Every structure is written in C-alpha cells, then in structure tokens.
C-alpha cells in the first residue's frame, strides 16, 4: 500500500483516497500504522476511511497523517457523528461516503460494503449529511462499482443537483474515457 501510494503521488495524482472497505463489515479498525507510513511518503492530500465508528477513530486517523476522514456505515447509524466530527475538526476534513443502490425503483443507501440496504433514500441522506457538516460526499454507485462500464451518471447528477458541497464520483471506471 505504501509503495502504491508513493507511486500515485509521484505520478501526478492530486489526492489519494485509501478506503478499507471490509473494515466495518469485519468489525475492525483501519490500519493506523499504514496511514502513518503513507502520510510520510506522499505530498498530496490523503483521505482515509473504513472501520471508522466514533470521534476517537477520526481523531486518531487525522493524528496519523490523514488530511480527511471518510465515514460511511457509522454516519448512517449515528448521524450525530458527522456534526460532532465537523465541530471538532472542521467540515473540510469530514467526508461522508455514501454507497447508493437501486432497490425497488428507489435509490437507497447501503452500508457494510453494500451488504445491507438501509431505509434511507439516497438524496435525502446526501442532503442530511451536508446539513450535519460534511465537507464532501464520496458517492459510490454499488450498481456500477467493479463493472468498469463508467460512472452511474444519473445517480451522480441527482446527488450533485441536491447538495452544494463537492461530490467525488466513485464506482464504475474502467478506462480514461469514463472521465
């Protein structure tokens, strides 16, 4: 992970996002030592997420060298965490990762790496995350993630037209043409 991060940084990436997507599902924390090692060898912003369940986890990751912390499942289960984190550390370093999935003709929020469909509707959750203090949204369409046929443009347009904070597109890229 450290060598890949260094490679991306030296190759011109303008930001690096390291997500341990199985951490929440496996009920474990993100590897702090890896974050520390990566932060030492790159010169671009580093966003870290996965297994973040409370304010202490966010503080630990920022202290380890992360510039931003991404929260997903914990934010859905405890939305107040977004407010607490943004008040303590500033909204500029709080990224709410949202995994969206089409379910029964609606766009729903899923958690635990896409394994659990919640009752939250995607657009409502994005608006709520912003109102609670998220500085960015990392939007992943679970319908296109891993397929490599391009982003879910429809889902992204609906989210970006309903919030004013930056939305990072994730899930579906297979070639440069998808950008």
Kindly give the residue locations of the regions a language model identified:
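Catalytic cores of alpha/beta
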Residues: 39-69, 154-179
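Glycine-rich, proline-tolerant flexible connector loops at the mouths of alpha/beta enzymes
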Residues: 13-34, 73, 138-150
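Charged helix-capping and loop-helix junction motifs
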Residues: 1, 29-36, 79, 118-123, ...
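A structural motif
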Residues: 13-14, 43, 66, 134
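Conserved, mostly hydrophobic/aromatic
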Residues: 8, 16, 48, 61, ...
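Short catalytic helix/loop segments, enriched in acidic residues and glycine
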Residues: 1-9
